[in-house]
């Protein structure tokens, strides 16, 4: 279309003298038209940009079919993996236009159902709906391939709806139900499962009564079997088996009181970091207390020894000084005529360092009588500072005599 416009513009171009305006104009228009048409052509391709374009709003569904007079079916959404339902118009099956009705793959699928889309073989055989669908499919084989395919799809949908009631848990096969995990029996340890939050979360042991219906050509036998199995849902479970019921408010980490089949009581799991004896801070506290008590006892004994030794030293020194004083007093007050005085002098009575290395030889001391002492003019001094004897027992010694005696003793 735009090429015709360009051709018309080129034919209608007016050639002015010196200015070919028509040629320039149609070149510019052609470039503009190409720039507009190229993105539209790219959007129609199967590239990744096609999915980013906004989709047109869907048309509202028809509420009434004008041909058959029956209410029209609501079309399936675009994102649904299930194929749209086939409408029956005037007793004939009408397939979608985009789908071929006579494919060799579809004909093979009509004769042999696909494995894995339905339930396990035991469940497929036991379902009454499958029996009806198989009978209808056998009648539809003679009718035609489109009707066979529609009936097979309908039978598969019935199987998906009746999956829970016809599931055989003894085979421990996984189910196709969302948020539902069925486990087979694993042993006697199922009742001792660890539960962090008792009564709210965690798997528990559940027994489900399942009814399995088996359809035979002549007779129909219904058997009810109780199969213990473990059911995990989103978080809220319930125990139905009275033998393995766990109370909701009691933690499962406690030791189980019910013995197992062997008669042995199963021990609960030990928590990591839990010690069987005292804690670390208790051991440290006891050790420090013992050390302090022992140190106090040692200090008391040392102080007692020191006090006893110092008391003995003081007592011994005082006794020695007393003995020295008594001895010096005795030496000064007792002057026999034929005896030489001892090594301790009057001036060394209270000094232990001044001792004579040998006995001093004294010359003959004149004998003084009481008259001579009283008649001698001078001062008299007592040399004893302790407990004085009576005046009759004391002997007064003149100072001149003491000084003379000091010079006469060679020490």
Curated annotation (Swiss-Prot):
Location relative to the cell: Basolateral cell membrane; Apical cell membrane; Cell junction, Adherens junction
What does the UniProt entry list as the effect of changing residue 350 to A? Predominantly localized to the apical membrane
The main place the protein resides is membrane
Protein's name according to its UniProt entry? Adherens junction-associated protein 1
Instruction: Please give the residue ranges for the topological domain Cytoplasmic.
Output: 304-411
Q: Which InterPro entries match?
A: AJAP1, AJAP1_PANP_C
A GO BP annotation: regulation of polarized epithelial cell differentiation
Q: Which residues cross the membrane?
A: 283-303
DNA-binding as a keyword of this entry, yes or no, is: no
* Keyword annotations from UniProtKB, A to Z: Cell adhesion, Cell junction, Cell membrane, Membrane, Phosphoprotein, Signal, Transmembrane, Transmembrane helix
List compositional bias (Polar residues) regions by residue number: 166-178
**What the protein does?**
Plays a role in cell adhesion and cell migration.
Q: What are the record's GO terms for cellular component?
A: adherens junction; apical plasma membrane; basolateral plasma membrane; cell surface; cell-cell contact zone; cytoplasmic side of plasma membrane; plasma membrane
Q: How does it assemble?
A: Forms a complex with CDH1 and CTNNB1; interacts directly with CTNNB1. Interacts with AP1M2. Interacts with isoform 2 of BSG/CD147.
Summed up, the tissue specificity of this protein is: Expressed in uterus and pancreas (at protein level).
Q: Impact of changing residue 396 to A on the protein?
A: Predominantly localized to the apical membrane
Provide the membrane-side ranges marked Extracellular in the record.
44-282
Q: How is it modified after translation?
A: Thr-237 and Ser-239 may be phosphorylated; however as this position is probably extracellular, the in vivo relevance is not proven.
Highest taxon above the source species: Eukaryota
Q: Where is the composition biased (Low complexity)?
A: 115-146, 247-263
In this chain, the stretch annotated as Disordered covers 89-108, 115-197, 239-268, 311-330
Region labeled Targeting signals — which residues? 303-411
Molecular function terms from GO:
beta-catenin binding; protein domain specific binding; protein-containing complex binding
Please give one Pfam family short name.
Answer: AJAP1_PANP_C
């Amino acid at each position: 279309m735009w090429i015709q416009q360009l051709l018309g513009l080129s034919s209608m171009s007016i050639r002015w003298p010196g200015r070919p305006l028509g040629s320039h104009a149609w070149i510019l228009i052609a470039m503009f038209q190409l720039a507009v048409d190229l993105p539209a052509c790219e959007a129609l391709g199967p590239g990744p940009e096609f999915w980013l374009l906004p989709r047109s709003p869907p048309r509202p569904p028809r509420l009434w079919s004008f041909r058959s007079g029956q209410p029209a079916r609501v079309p399936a959404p675009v994102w649904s993996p299930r194929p749209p339902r086939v409408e029956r118009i005037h007793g004939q099956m009408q397939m979608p236009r985009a789908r071929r009705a006579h494919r060799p793959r579809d004909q093979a699928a009509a004769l042999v159902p696909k494995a894995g889309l339905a339930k396990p073989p035991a469940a497929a055989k036991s379902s009454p709906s499958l029996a009806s669908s198989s009978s209808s499919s056998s009648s539809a084989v003679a009718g035609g391939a489109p009707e066979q395919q529609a009936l097979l799809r309908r039978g598969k949908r019935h199987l998906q709806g009746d999956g829970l009631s016809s599931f055989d848990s003894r085979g421990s096969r996984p189910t196709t139900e969302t948020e539902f995990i069925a486990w087979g029996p694993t042993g006697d340890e199922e009742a001792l499962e660890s539960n962090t939050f008792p009564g709210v979360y965690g798997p528990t042991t559940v027994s489900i009564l399942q009814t399995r219906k088996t359809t035979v050509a002549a007779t129909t036998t219904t058997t009810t079997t109780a199969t213990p199995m473990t059911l995990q849902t989103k978080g809220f479970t319930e125990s139905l088996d009275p033998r393995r019921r766990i109370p909701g408010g009691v933690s499962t980490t406690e030791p189980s009181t019910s013995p197992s089949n062997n008669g042995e009581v199963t021990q609960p799991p030990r928590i990591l970091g839990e010690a069987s004896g005292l804690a670390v801070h208790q051991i440290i506290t006891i050790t420090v207390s013992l050390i302090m008590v022992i140190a106090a006892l040692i200090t008391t004994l040392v102080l007692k020894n020191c006090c006893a030794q110092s008391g003995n030293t003081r007592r011994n020194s005082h006794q020695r000084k007393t003995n020295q004083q008594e001895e010096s007093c005795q030496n000064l007050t007792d002057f026999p005529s034929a005896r030489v005085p001892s090594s301790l002098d009057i001036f060394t009575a209270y000094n232990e360092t001044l001792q004579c290395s040998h006995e001093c030889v004294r010359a003959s001391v004149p004998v003084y009588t009481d008259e001579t002492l009283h008649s001698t003019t001078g001062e008299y001094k007592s040399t004893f500072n302790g407990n004085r004897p009576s005046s009759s027992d004391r002997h007064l010694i003149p100072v001149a005599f003491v000084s003379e005696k000091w010079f006469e003793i060679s020490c």
